Amino acid sequence: MKNLFLFCRAGYEKECAAEIQQRAAELNVGGFVKTNNNDAYVVYQCFEDDGADTLVKQLPLDSLIFARQMFAASELLADLPESDRVSPIVAALSEVSKAGELRVETPDTNEAKELSAFCRKFTVPLRQHLKKSGSLLAQENPKRPIIHVCFIGPGRAYAGYSLSNNSSPNFMGIPRLKMAADAPSRSSLKLDEAFAQFVPKEEQEERVRSGMNAVDLGACPGGWTYQLVRRGMFVSAVDNGPMNEKLMETGQVKHFREDGFRFEPQRKNIYWLVCDMVEKPARVAELIEAWAINGWFKEAIFNLKLPMKSRYKEVMAILNTMQDILKENGITEFKLQCKHLYHDRDEVTVHLWLKPSQPWN
C-alpha cells in the first residue's frame, strides 16, 4: 500500500505532517502529505507502491510525537454506494491476509463522530465478509495485523492495516480513562495517560510502585500529585499555592510552599519527578536538565507548553538540546520520549528515564 494514514488532534495536522515528512525521509521513503486544517488526520502518500508497508514496519509509532495511531491505507474509497459499501472495502483489503481484529473508526472531530453509530452497525456485516474473503480470521488474535476502516465522511473511507506490535491498542488511538470523582483537577488524567503511554504494563509494578518517593513541581491544586498518591507514593508537592485538603489528609504528601524553579530536594532518594507548570517550554526543559545533571531523580514526566507557531520545530529543538546537554554532562545512557497525549491540549508530554539498564539505588 502507498498511503500512510495518521490520526492526530484536530488543529495539529501541520505538526503531524511535518513530522511524518521528516521521519519518512530518514527511512528513504519519499512521498508527500495530504491534509486539511481541523480534519484530525494526515495522509502521507508514498511514491513507491509499498512505501506505507515499509513505514508501518520500520517507523515505531511510539517515536512519533503528534500521531495517535497509523495504518497503511488504500486510496480513498470515495462515493461508496449505499446499496453495497462492503464490496469495495473488501476488494481494497485483498492484500491483507488473516488479520486478527477489525476497527471501523472515524477521525476525532465532532463532524466525523456523527458517523460513529453507523460505524458500529456497519462493523457486523463488514466483519462477516472479511472473514469469508480470508482477510480476517474467524477468531480475534492480538498477535495478527489489525484491519482499519476509517470513514472521513458519509460514503468516504480509507481501508488498510496496522501491525499489532506497532500500533495503539486503543480505538482511534484514544485511551478511555475515567476522571476520578475525588481528583483535584482534570489535569490528573494527563499523568494517568502518561504512565500508560511511557511505562509498559508489564513494567509498571517495578517502575510505578507503592512506597516510592516523588516530587511534583508546580503541584497546586494536586492533579498530578493525586496520581502519585493513588499509586502509593510519598510526594513532595512544591507550589506557593494551596493543595487539595483531601490529598494532604492522606499523610503521603508534604507541601513545600516555594517556587518550583528554586526547590532542591532535601533527600536524594527521588524516583519520580513530575512537572506541569505553565511556563516557557525552554525554561522547564532547563529545570529538568539541571535535576538530571544533579542526579536527583530516576524517571521524569513533564509537560512543555507549545507556542502558537512552529510547534514541531520548537519541540524538536528543545528535545535535541536536552540530549546534547545530558551527553555533555556525562549522562550517556538515557531514554527520551515525547507524545502529544489525548488529554494534552496545546502542550506535549515528555518522559526522561536516566540509566534504564541500571537498577534504582
From Swiss-Prot:
InterPro entries given in the database record: RlmM_FDX, RlmM_THUMP-like, RNA_MeTrfase_FtsJ_dom, rRNA_MeTrfase_M, SAM-dependent_MTases_sf
GO biological process, any: rRNA processing
Residues spanning the signal sequence: none
Active-site annotation: K305 (proton acceptor)
Cellular compartments annotated: Cytoplasm
Domain of life: Bacteria
Catalytic reaction list: cytidine(2498) in 23S rRNA + S-adenosyl-L-methionine = 2'-O-methylcytidine(2498) in 23S rRNA + S-adenosyl-L-homocysteine + H(+)
Presence of keyword ATP-binding: no
Broad enzyme group: transferase
Listed GO MF terms: rRNA (cytosine-2'-O-)-methyltransferase activity
Pfam families reported in the protein's UniProt record: FtsJ (PF01728), RlmM_FDX (PF18125), RLMM_N (PF21239)
UniProt EC number: 2.1.1.186
Main localisation: cytoplasm
UniProt KW keywords: Cytoplasm, Methyltransferase, rRNA processing, S-adenosyl-L-methionine, Transferase
Residue numbers binding S-adenosyl-L-methionine: S187, C220, P221, G222, G223, D239, D259, D276
SUPFAM superfamilies xrefs: S-adenosyl-L-methionine-dependent methyltransferases (SSF53335)
NCBIfam families registered for this protein in UniProt: PRK11760.1 (NF008734)
Quaternary data: Monomer.
Family from the record: Belongs to the class I-like SAM-binding methyltransferase superfamily. RNA methyltransferase RlmE family. RlmM subfamily.
Summary of the function given for this chain in its UniProt record: Catalyzes the 2'-O-methylation at nucleotide C2498 in 23S rRNA.
Name of the protein described by the UniProt record: Ribosomal RNA large subunit methyltransferase M
Gene from which this protein is expressed: rlmM
